[in-house]
Each structure stands twice: as C-alpha cells, then as structure tokens.
Amino acid sequence: MPRDRAGTFTPRMLPKGTRRLTELDDMIISLYAGGMTVRDIQHHLATTLSMDMSPDTISTITDAVLEEVMIWQNRQLDEFYPVIFLDALRVKIRDGHRVVNKSCYMAVGVDMDGIKHILGLWIADNEGASFWASVCADLANRGVQDAFIVCCDGLKGLPEAVEATWPNSMVQTCIVHLIRAANRWVSYQDRKPVSSALREVYTAPTEDTARAALDAFEASELGRKYPQSVKVWRDAWDRFVPFLQFPPAARRVLYTTNSIESLNAELRKATRNRGQFPNDTAALKTLWLMICNIEDKRAAQRAKKAKRAIECNGYIEGAKATGWKQAINQLAVAYPDRFADYL
C-alpha cells in the first residue's frame, strides 16, 4: 500500500482495516447457499480466481450468517395463522465417529392474506411428546396465539402438544402424505388405478360417502391385492375425517402443498450434494441459506410477472396459497367467532 505524508490515501479494492473483500465473502455465501460444498467452493475459487483459500476459512466466512439465522429463528410471528403445516426433511449429521439420520422439521404458516411463511426450523434425533411440546411452546412464545388447523403427517405426540398449546386448533393428517404412504407398497403399474380409487375417498362430500368408497376399494381386486394401502387409511381415519367437514376450496388449501413439496425437493437435492453435515448448527445454517436462496428466486420470478419491485422485509416469504380468497371465506363460515377476533 502506498504511503503519503498526510495519510490521505484510501485504497478502493481493499478498505483500510479489512482482511477480506466483502464482495468475495458475499460470493462465497451465495455459492454455499446454491448447494456447493466447502470443497466445491475451494476448487471454484482456485480455478476461476487463482485463489488458494482453505476450507476452514470458507467455513468461517459462511458462519457469519449464524447471527442472522438466530435472529430469524427467534423473530416475532403473527398472532394468528389460519393454517400451519409441519413437514420433515431427513439429513445426515456426524455424531462422533458415525453418521446418523436426523429430522429437520419445518413449520409453514399461511397468513390471512394466503402468503406462506416458514416459521422455523428444528433439528431432532427423534420426535415425541416433549419435542413437539417445545416446538409449540417456541411458536407460542414468539407470538402465535391460535391456528384453525395444524396439518401434519401423523407425527407422534403432536396432537397432544397442539391441544395443550392451542386448545381450539384442529390437528389434520396431511392428505398428500396419506396418499404417498398408501402407494408405498403398490407396484408401479398399479399406482394410477389405486390413486384413482383412493381419490374417491378424500374427495367424498361426507364421512359416510368416504367410508363407503374405502369399503368398496377394500372389497375390490386392487384392495385385496394391496391390503396395506387400506390399512394406512383405516389407521389414520380419526385424523382424516375432520378434513371432510370443509367445502372444496378449503380442502384444496389443505391437500395442495405443491410449494412446500417443491421447496423440500430442492432442499433434498442440495443436501444430497453435501452428503453429511459436521453438526446440527452446520445443517441449520445450510438449510436456512438454501431456503433464502430458493425463496429469493421465487420472489424475483413473482415480481417479474407482476412487473413490480421486490419488497424485502427480512423474512422468508413463500408463494400465495391457491384459491385462498374462497378458502378463507369458507374457513370464516366454519369458525365465525374466532375469525372475527383476528380481522
């Protein structure tokens, strides 16, 4: 760096007192959020910028977002979400000298405007009553006072935790997961007719019609061939039946989870590239960056279609629920007193 008597020289490329380029840090974080591993980024910097940077340095740079992750994870939430979805993603994390499978649970809340927000991420070795009690308490402590429906995949201990935290909320088994579980043991060539037959169950206008459709499937050739598919629905029947009380538009919000499924698909793709994570914090950091990256792309696409500027509010915001206006009106009819409290 040149020296001058008055000390007025200010470098443009590397400001005084800094050791790294902030633009380079941003690029490394962007590559990491895009799904590249630390070794991939090291190779990329070496080949494109002829820069030799150690994996530890790259990891330290990406750790700079941990404070943002904690702020996001502890942020205040809306007091009411008409619908909350809970879904899980399996990740491999090192535990000493072995690699274990852990579940990363994601809560997605649909607000009064139909916008889907990721409320939080939690990594756990196994689910249970105490775990779900802590998750519900976390959401409640951050401001969530009520939800009409909590939609999940028959998670153990969750109904009890929801009833203790939000006594008026209804726990609903996720229809998408039920369909997937019913098709798990079905051969590929039979999946289409089995799915078509089971569609008569979850699109039935009443509980009696749905039960008759399931009985008819059980008595059919396909039902006798795949009794496990019938058992899946029988076992989940008590948690499935409340779904039938809603009109079609509200039902579509509950079983149309395309945006959540597509988000999970992209997260699975990125986690497969990494193989395994050194610890829970690294997994949480990586998933948060991936979600930000994915939702930023979606927001840019929506803004381009609407020909308007992107509004950055510091939150991870997803797509709008399909047919929401009709659905929220139907939910308002189903829960008139509670709905009026949050207008």
UniProtKB/Swiss-Prot annotation:
UniProtKB keywords: DNA recombination, DNA-binding, Transposable element, Transposition
UniProt keyword DNA-binding, yes or no: yes
GO MF: DNA binding; transposase activity
UniProt GO BP: DNA transposition
Family from the record: Belongs to the transposase mutator family.
Its job: Required for the transposition of the insertion element.
Name of the protein in question: Probable transposase for insertion sequence element
Lineage: Bacteria, Bacillati, Actinomycetota, Actinomycetes, Mycobacteriales
